[in-house]
Design a protein with these regions (language model features):
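Anion-binding and metal-coordination hotspots
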Residues: 1-184
Length: 184
């Protein structure tokens, strides 16, 4: 697994990143928001993390629900005001609004969740180890020589396929790049 530079993706962090991106974009295009919750949202995230460490899960859920509501308010405010804006401004917001909708709508058991705002290709890969159960990144196959560990090829495999199914394509790529066939 080639890990990406992402922190452990909690719901609260993703909500706060959505809010930050939306507020930053609205400032850039001079869209006046009714409220941007620049004090309340980080405070709610902090409190949710505090409640989690104190094992006060009901309070944590309440804080996260409030945070999610605030992000939804900012999103709807921007969507309302974009109707009066020119097409180029609307197109600048398309990707960010789509990611925000996706993050606000995803549930725990959903497939194809968004784990990172800046790197949407990140997947959750279960490792089966006690100390590190999950890694967030993309599965890769790296082909090296037997004696000197010289890298012949590297390839990413989106969708977390079974390792045995990736071997043939890695060897094929190494054969194409090096010009020699691998020995059995």
């Amino acid at each position: 697994v080639q890990e990406k530079a992402v922190t452990y993706p909690t719901d609260g962090k993703l909500y706060e990143r959505c809010r930050q991106h939306l507020v930053r974009l609205s400032r850039r295009y001079r869209i006046k928001l009714w409220q941007n919750y620049s004090r309340k949202a980080p405070y709610l995230l902090l409190m949710a993390n505090r409640y989690h460490s104190a094992k006060q899960m009901k309070r944590k859920r309440k804080a996260l629900k409030q945070l999610k509501t605030l992000v939804g308010r900012v999103q709807r405010d921007i969507e309302r005001q974009l109707q009066a804006q020119p097409e180029e401004v609307r197109s600048a917001f398309d990707e960010t609004l789509e990611k925000t909708r996706r993050i606000l709508g995803q549930q725990r058991q959903d497939k194809d969740k968004l784990y990172s705002f800046h790197a949407p290709e990140v997947e959750c890969i279960a490792k089966g180890k006690a100390h590190k159960k999950y890694e967030f990144g993309v599965k890769v196959g790296i082909t090296v020589t037997n004696k000197s560990n010289f890298v012949l090829g590297a390839r990413s495999f989106p969708g977390n396929p079974y390792d045995g199914h990736t071997l043939e394509s890695c060897l094929e790529q190494a054969e194409i790049l090096s010009g020699t066939r691998a020995k059995e």
